[in-house]
Every structure is written in C-alpha cells, then in structure tokens.
C-alpha cells in the first residue's frame, strides 16, 4: 500500500462544539497519523481561494461565510491510501446518508454543517496542504 498524505479541515460547527479531540481520536483509530495541525480563523480570502472550485455554485457565498464564522482546525494526515481512507472515515456529505461510526454520522449537524472536509484526490491534497502548511510544518 502507498503511504500518502491528505488534507483535513475540522469545520466551525465542530470546533464550536469542542469536538477536535473526539474527531482526532476517530482519525487515529482508523490508522491515520496527524502529522501537522493548526487551529486558525480562516480569512475570507483564504476561504474563497480554497473553495474556488465551487464559485459558480449557489451555495458558494454561504459556504465562505460559514467557513469564516469561527475557528477551524487544518490538518495533514498520513497513512496507507490516506485520501481514500479518510473519505471513508468522514462518511457521506449528507450525515443522514453516512455510514454508522463515521465522523459525519456521529458529529455532523446537517449537510452544510458536516463537521469535516477531506481532499478528494492525492493531487488536490497536495494543493490544499500547500495553502496552509510548508513542508517544514509537517513532522512525521
């Protein structure tokens, strides 16, 4: 299996409910290592850049507002097939459709407030990681 990295965000709905430790425990129990982590307040510019792929979607403005509404925790996760593994651990975007035991099934409030973001490919993970971390920030 290939060791790879993926990017994660614990969103404002999760940090507001003090779920960082609980979500980190799920991540680590799944065999992923947290090799970089930082709690930040995402700026509007950062959120717009990060979610630029959704700029033409009707929910874009709401998404940017939500992601800047409170602290988030940005993370780099590492492990065997980390991108696919973390997407499995997160669960479906809609928590009502997420599998039992997944982060979104356990902690998400709604489709919009679904607690976590995870990269959808290794290529996007590298781009997303670089928006928030330098290689020196990532310690294995």
Curated annotation (Swiss-Prot):
It is an enzyme of class 2 (transferase). It comes from the Bacteria. InterPro entries: NDK-like_dom, NDK-like_dom_sf, Nucleoside_diP_kinase. Its cofactor is Mg(2+). GO terms for cellular component: cytoplasm. Signal peptide: none annotated. ATP binds at residues 11, 59, 87, 93, 104, 114. It is found in: Cytoplasm. GO terms for biological process: CTP biosynthetic process; GTP biosynthetic process; UTP biosynthetic process. The active site is at 117 (pros-phosphohistidine intermediate). The keyword Transmembrane helix does not apply. Pfam families: NDK. Keywords: ATP-binding, Cytoplasm, Kinase, Magnesium, Metal-binding, Nucleotide metabolism, Nucleotide-binding, Phosphoprotein, Transferase. Its EC number is 2.7.4.6. GO terms for molecular function: ATP binding; metal ion binding; nucleoside diphosphate kinase activity. Major role in the synthesis of nucleoside triphosphates other than ATP. The ATP gamma phosphate is transferred to the NDP beta phosphate via a ping-pong mechanism, using a phosphorylated active-site intermediate. NCBIfam families: PRK00668.1. Belongs to the NDK family. Homotetramer. This is Nucleoside diphosphate kinase. It comes from Methylobacterium sp. (strain 4-46). The lineage of its organism: Bacteria, Pseudomonadati, Pseudomonadota, Alphaproteobacteria, Hyphomicrobiales. The gene is ndk.
């Amino acid at each position: 299996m290939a060791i790879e990295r993926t990017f994660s965000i614990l969103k404002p709905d999760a940090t507001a409910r003090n779920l960082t430790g609980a979500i980190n425990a799920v991540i680590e129990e799944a065999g992923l290592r947290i090799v970089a982590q930082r709690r930040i307040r995402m700026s509007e510019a950062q959120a717009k850049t990060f979610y630029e792929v959704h700029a033409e979607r009707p929910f874009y403005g709401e998404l940017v507002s939500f992601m800047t509404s409170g602290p988030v925790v940005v993370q780099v996760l590492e492990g065997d097939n980390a991108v696919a593994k973390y997407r499995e651990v997160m669960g479906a975007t809609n928590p009502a459709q997420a599998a039992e035991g997944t982060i979104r099934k356990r902690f998400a409030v709604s489709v919009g407030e679904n607690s976590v973001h995870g990269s959808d490919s290794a290529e996007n993970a590298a781009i997303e990681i670089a928006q928030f971390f330098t290689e020196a920030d990532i310690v294995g």
